[in-house]
């Protein structure tokens, strides 16, 4: 029997506000433990929350960008539970009437088809504190308590771990492009829980669901869902009974680990938050927020394909972050060579950034300098290989490529006569290569070209070298 997965994702995104959702404490990441706190976010008696207007605006903005309907009347609710990271013993969130509902994201599958993943709801809530487990005991840091979140709950429309990854990547790119969240998974500002079950292909009845936590990267998400899918299929095939569980992804051992069995009934005893009034959102407010939404990543990617003529794949990669998209567009315009701009950014520049673990915004050179490098190569002033060496220098120093070329004497040798002299010398010293060429071994020419480039320290024009070597070899 063939099975398929039924997957839904719950994504928590910390909002990029300066202050917390119900008080004036800073949302800055880090800091000494329990220094970004006040009576409100600590839940001390007599303290009263006040809803941050910017949080509501960001909730509306996210909803519009994700094709949601905005609930014009919504409210905050108390979610009651006891845990050390929750100082009030309840979380102020939204239950029955969230700020947004019925949205969707479109992802592109491997075969080029588009698939729509439904979004059931988006609701606003406060984050909890953080627990630090030590040998001596467990410590609690409440700096994060009260930091504003939106939780984006997908419908169970996802059928493979790969689709789940594409959904999360698309969601991340949209949220960061509209600047409601920095979406830094390594800092916990974008967190994802997954719900997965399996069912026979063609069936409409979902199986028993597992919730998976601690998936803090795209790779972890895909691996955890794949593992859990295999575990469910194996259990069902053997006739074993699965229980509804919450499990944790163990990255070190590449397995999911049981955290707790889950009660089927909702035991959080939600009820309306009496200290906050019902929220009324006018059409005028929604339209004001709509005007602040920039060109979204998929719209930008489509424009890049049409305007710059780059491949669709390149456009999708370049628009994963707005910083990269902006850097590409400025370079493409200034260099008048969009394909070269795309190749440099997706190739050598991305490699260097990955090696040093830095982002585009932290590069020491700007789009104008990269455009200058591309123009130097296109004009024949330097070769592509020399261009890579110049880029390495730009990456370290931030110097202009022209200055680097002049300082290091890297100008390309386009003098065919001078190159001919080097070629003759190389051929004279390598008679066996000429013999191999005559015997039909075309690669012998490549060997000779390599020797010429080495002799000229990479400064000879490769096109001229190839031409002269071929001409001289054919004379022999």
Swiss-Prot record:
SUPFAM superfamilies referenced in this protein's UniProt entry, alphabetically: GatB/YqeY motif, Glutamine synthetase/guanido kinase
Biological processes per GO annotation: glutaminyl-tRNAGln biosynthesis via transamidation; translation
Entry annotated with the keyword Ligase: yes
UniProt cross-references to Pfam families, sorted A to Z: GatB_N (PF02934), GatB_Yqey (PF02637)
MF term (GO), any: asparaginyl-tRNA synthase (glutamine-hydrolyzing) activity
Residue spans crossing the bilayer: none
Enzyme class of the recorded protein, top EC level: ligase
Reaction equations catalysed: L-glutamyl-tRNA(Gln) + L-glutamine + ATP + H2O = L-glutaminyl-tRNA(Gln) + L-glutamate + ADP + phosphate + H(+); L-aspartyl-tRNA(Asn) + L-glutamine + ATP + H2O = L-asparaginyl-tRNA(Asn) + L-glutamate + ADP + phosphate + 2 H(+)
Keywords linked to the UniProt accession: ATP-binding, Ligase, Nucleotide-binding, Protein biosynthesis
EC number(s) on file: 6.3.5.-
Function: Allows the formation of correctly charged Asn-tRNA(Asn) or Gln-tRNA(Gln) through the transamidation of misacylated Asp-tRNA(Asn) or Glu-tRNA(Gln) in organisms which lack either or both of asparaginyl-tRNA or glutaminyl-tRNA synthetases. The reaction takes place in the presence of glutamine and ATP through an activated phospho-Asp-tRNA(Asn) or phospho-Glu-tRNA(Gln).
Family: Belongs to the GatB/GatE family. GatB subfamily.
PANTHER family, A to Z: GLUTAMYL-TRNA GLN AMIDOTRANSFERASE SUBUNIT B MITOCHONDRIAL AND PROKARYOTIC PET112-RELATED, GLUTAMYL-TRNA(GLN) AMIDOTRANSFERASE SUBUNIT B, MITOCHONDRIAL
Subunit annotation: Heterotrimer of A, B and C subunits.
Name this protein carries in UniProt: Aspartyl/glutamyl-tRNA(Asn/Gln) amidotransferase subunit B
Originating organism: Clostridium botulinum (strain Loch Maree / Type A3)
Gene: gatB
């Amino acid at each position: 029997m063939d099975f398929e997965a039924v997957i839904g994702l719950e994504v928590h995104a910390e909002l990029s506000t300066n202050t917390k959702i119900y008080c004036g404490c800073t949302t800055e990441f880090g800091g000494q433990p329990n220094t970004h706190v006040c009576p409100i976010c600590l839940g001390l008696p007599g303290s009263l929350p006040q809803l941050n207007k910017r949080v509501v605006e960001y909730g509306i903005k996210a909803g519009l960008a994700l094709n949601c309907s905005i609930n014009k009347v919504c409210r905050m609710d108390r979610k009651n539970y006891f845990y050390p990271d929750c100082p009030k013993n309840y979380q102020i969130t939204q239950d029955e009437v969230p700020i947004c509902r019925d949205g969707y994201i479109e992802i592109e599958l491997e075969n080029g088809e588009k698939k729509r993943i439904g979004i059931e709801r988006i609701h606003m809530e406060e984050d909890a504190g953080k627990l630090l487990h030590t040998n001596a005991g467990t410590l609690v840091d409440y700096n994060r308590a009260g930091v504003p979140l939106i939780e984006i709950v997908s419908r169970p429309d996802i059928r493979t771990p790969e689709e789940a990854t594409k959904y999360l990547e698309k969601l991340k790119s949209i949220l960061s492009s509209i600047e409601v969240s920095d979406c830094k998974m390594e800092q916990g500002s974008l967190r994802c829980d997954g719900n997965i079950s399996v069912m026979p292909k063609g069936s409409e009845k979902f199986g028993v669901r597992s919730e998976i936590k601690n998936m803090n990267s795209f790779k972890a998400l895909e691996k955890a869902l794949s593992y859990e899918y295999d575990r469910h299929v194996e259990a069902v095939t053997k006739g074993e009974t699965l229980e509804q569980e919450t499990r944790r992804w163990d990255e070190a051992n590449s397995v999911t680990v049981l955290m707790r069995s889950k009660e089927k009934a909702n035991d959080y005893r939600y009820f309306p938050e009496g200290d906050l009034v019902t929220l009324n959102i006018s059409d005028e407010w929604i339209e004001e927020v709509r005007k602040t939404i920039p060109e979204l990543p998929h719209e930008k990617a489509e424009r890049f394909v049409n305007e710059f003529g780059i491949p669709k794949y390149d456009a999708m990669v370049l628009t994963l972050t707005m910083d990269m998209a902006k850097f590409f567009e400025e370079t493409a315009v200034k260099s008048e060579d969009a394909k070269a701009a795309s190749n440099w950014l997706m190739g050598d520049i991305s490699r260097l950034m990955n090696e040093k673990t830095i982002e585009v915004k932290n590069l020491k050179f700007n789009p104008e300098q990269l455009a200058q490098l591309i123009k130097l190569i296109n004009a024949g002033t330097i070769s592509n290989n020399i261009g890579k060496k110049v880029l390495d220098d730009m990456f370290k120093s931030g110097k202009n490529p022209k200055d680097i070329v002049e300082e290091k004497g890297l100008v390309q040798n386009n003098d065919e006569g001078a190159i001919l002299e080097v070629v003759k010398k190389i051929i004279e010293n390598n008679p066996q290569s000429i013999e191999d060429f005559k015997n039909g071994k075309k690669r012998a020419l490549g060997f000779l070209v390599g020797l010429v480039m080495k002799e000229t320290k990479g400064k000879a024009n490769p096109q001229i070298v190839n031409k002269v070597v071929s001409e001289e070899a054919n004379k022999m």
